[in-house]
Amino acid sequence: MEHKETGCQQPEGPILCINNCGFFGSAATMNMCSKCHKEMIMKQEQAKLAASSIDSIVNGGDSGKEPIIAGHAEVAVAQVEVKTLVAQPAEIAGPSEGVTVNPKGREGPNRCSTCRKRVGLTGFNCRCGNLYCAMHRYSDKHDCQFDYRTAARDAIAKANPVVKAEKLDKI
């Protein structure tokens, strides 16, 4: 009898979440489960942040002068058309040249240029432009025609330009 007098009543049964997620909700979380309630709060906070950032952008950085009202923010998004131009390799080379360009690159399996062994994905590309196995990957093992010394000299000269000061006049 004391329960009826104080006004505390137990619920008749467990209440399912209003989002139909399968969990039980409570009156403290607006008949939502804890997960759905947390997601709803996060969405409201993100909407507030979005509204304040849009307001600061529109007003030129005058944030904090006007109060932000919690609610739904309507945002207009402009559609941007992106046009890409794709040039075919034959168009770049020109129709007058008799060179055929293979868009795939190499035909068939990847093979070492020296021993013709199948290398698959473990092949090593050399600076001379060929593919080699683990045994022939070094330049001294496959008679590489690439001049590493000149390439390194040019790279160092490009990275470190000569700085020369003007001569000073004597007084």
From Swiss-Prot:
SMART domains: ZnF_A20, ZnF_AN1. SUPFAM superfamilies: AN1-like Zinc finger, Glucocorticoid receptor-like (DNA-binding domain). It holds the Pfam family zf-AN1. A zinc finger (AN1-type) spans 106-152. GO terms for molecular function: DNA binding; zinc ion binding. Zn(2+) 1 binds at C17, C21, C33, C36. InterPro entries: AN1-like_Znf (IPR035896), AN1_A20_ZnFinger (IPR050652), Znf_A20 (IPR002653), Znf_AN1 (IPR000058). Zn(2+) 2 binds at C112, C115, C133, H136. Keywords: Metal-binding, Stress response, Zinc, Zinc-finger. A zinc finger (A20-type) spans 11-45. The keyword Cytoplasm does not apply. Induction: By cold, dehydration and salt stress. Zn(2+) 3 binds at C126, C128, H142, C144. The keyword Kinase does not apply. May be involved in environmental stress response. This is Zinc finger A20 and AN1 domain-containing stress-associated protein 8. The gene is SAP8.
